[in-house]
Amino acid sequence: MKLLVLICRLIQKKSVCIRFGNDYDAKCENIVSLQGGIIAWVKCCRYLGVFFVSGRFFKCCFDHAKCSLFSSFNSIFGKVGRFASEEVVISLLKAKCLPCFLYGLEVCPVIMRDKRSFDFYITRLFMKLFRTGSAAIVEQCQKHFDFLPIRYVIDIRTASFIERYLESTNQICMLFKQRAASNLQIIFSNYGNTVCSSNSLKTIINTSFFG
């Protein structure tokens, strides 16, 4: 019995309630357990490393991911700084910083405004690295060092994820296959009528950006 009470207390400390939909801003009473613990309603919560924000529609908050990107980059740049070449710093950025930044984005609703914001943050990092204030120079540096803009990376990762999702035989996943297929076609349609897979999408994007 004591073990059960302890487990319940641990669950309560890690649990919150969040609302999505038309009544997302309606005031709700906190949930009280049999042991007297309170599970509060919140406007933002973290689940599996992804931050959800209460709203009329399901949406995510990427502020933590942006902070993690800057924190990890500044940590690396502060140690290697001007001692390492730009190529080495960018390789470290790809290997150590981007995985944390891109974590879970392929399954999150990312709108174009978010993608532009992500590209802006990467541009700022490149400006710091190459000591320039020109976005045009940053773009040329990205092409030279084989660094694809984040908006394209997200589309490729999302398309690849949806393709794997559509192949799943999980009964719950199958309930949303039609919606997933529709989202995949929307991504493909943004890059022309010849795109039919994530591989062809990647090829077209690389050809278009890198030339």
Please identify what each model-predicted range represents.
Residues M1-V5, F20-Y24, S54-F58, V110-M112:
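Catalytic palm subdomain of template-directed nucleic-acid polymerases
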Residues L3, S117-F126, T158-F161:
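Short amphipathic alpha-helical coiled-coil/interface segments
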Residues L3-Q12, M127-I137:
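Short helix-interrupting loop/turn segments at helix-coil junctions
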Residues C8-C44:
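Short, conserved micro-motifs composed of acidic
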Residues Q12-K14, V88-S91, G104-I111, A136-Q142, ...:
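Short coil/turn segments at secondary-structure boundaries
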Residues L34-P109:
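Basic, alpha-helical interaction scaffolds
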Residues S134, H144-G211:
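Acidic catalytic cores of enzymes that act on phosphate-bearing nucleotides/polynucleotides
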